[in-house]
């Protein structure tokens, strides 16, 4: 995956409750990202990935977001989602590698070993929320680790990826052997540049590029609140 090294990956996602929810639209969004210089795409769902791959010749990080009533993990968190994604053949499959509760009480070790046994050649990315989770995923053998879920899990509540000059990223990089793909609320070009300087393999940026309703809200909130926008 040298194609994305030191470069930008754009996350093109729109969930069912969002105005741009459409595989066609995500395909065009990927074209726009490519024209802007993106070196890769992150996408959610088999349909979106297939459409994106028909429109751009860029490596894809594929996921399936699916909520289970009994679990907290939700990004490609069972073999069902992995099997579905293999139909679309993304270059990398990202899975929930947090310590959050999983379906049926399955452990991350068990899940990881199942994937490796069935699809030994598939590149895997660990979406994590803490330094400890990323270090653990690295030791398990994930090809890439990522701080994607910082602030989105019970164990990372209140944490922000940019705190103390990206301390979470710096602390993790000092302890891992596999490359890190930085992702999660990296919402300015300056932040993206900084994490590359710190030594990450690549950086993923999503909402600030591809979710116009959220971009608009930032402008509206700042106008109405005298320089501050609501998170």
Segments from the language model and where they lie:
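A cross-family glycoside hydrolase active-site/sugar-binding cleft signature
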Residues: 11-13, 44, 61-63, 96, ...
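Short, structured secondary-structure boundary patches
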Residues: 60-67, 81-85, 115-119, 146-149, ...
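A short alpha-helix capping/helix-coil boundary motif
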Residues: 6-10, 27-29, 60-62, 90-92, ...
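C-terminal alpha-helical cap/extension of soluble enzyme domains
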Residues: 6-20, 162-231
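Short, surface-exposed, polar/charged, turn-prone segments marking secondary-structure boundaries
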Residues: 36-40, 69-72, 88-91, 120-123, ...
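Active-site-adjacent beta->alpha loops and helix N-cap segments on the catalytic face
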Residues: 20-23, 42-61, 73-79, 97-115, ...
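Glycine-rich phosphate-binding active-site loops on the catalytic face of alpha/beta enzymes
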Residues: 13-15, 64, 68, 88-102, ...
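Conserved N-terminal beta1-alpha1 strand-loop-helix module at the mouth
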Residues: 1-87, 118, 124, 132-144, ...
């Amino acid at each position: 995956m040298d194609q994305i090294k030191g470069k930008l990956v754009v996350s093109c996602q729109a969930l069912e409750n969002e105005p741009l929810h459409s595989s066609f639209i995500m395909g065009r969004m990927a074209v726009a990202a490519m024209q802007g210089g993106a070196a890769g795409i992150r996408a959610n769902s088999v349909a979106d990935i297939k459409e994106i791959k028909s429109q751009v010749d860029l490596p894809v990080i594929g996921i399936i977001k699916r909520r289970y009533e009994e679990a907290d993990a939700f990004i490609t968190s069972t073999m069902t989602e992995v099997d579905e994604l293999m139909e679309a053949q993304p270059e990398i499959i990202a899975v929930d590698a947090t310590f959050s509760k999983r379906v049926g009480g399955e452990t991350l070790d068990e899940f990881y070993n199942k994937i490796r046994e069935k699809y030994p050649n598939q590149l895997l990315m660990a979406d994590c929320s803490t330094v400890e989770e990323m270090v653990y995923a690295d030791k398990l053998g994930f090809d890439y680790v990522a701080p994607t879920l910082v602030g989105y899990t019970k164990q990372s509540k209140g944490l922000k990826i940019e705190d103390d000059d990206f301390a979470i990223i710096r602390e993790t990089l000092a302890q891992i052997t596999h490359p890190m793909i930085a992702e999660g609320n990296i919402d300015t070009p300056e932040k993206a540049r900084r994490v590359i300087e710190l030594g990450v393999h690549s950086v993923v940026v999503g909402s600030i590029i591809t979710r116009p309703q959220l971009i608009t809200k930032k402008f509206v909130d700042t106008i109405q609140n005298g320089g501050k926008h609501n998170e």
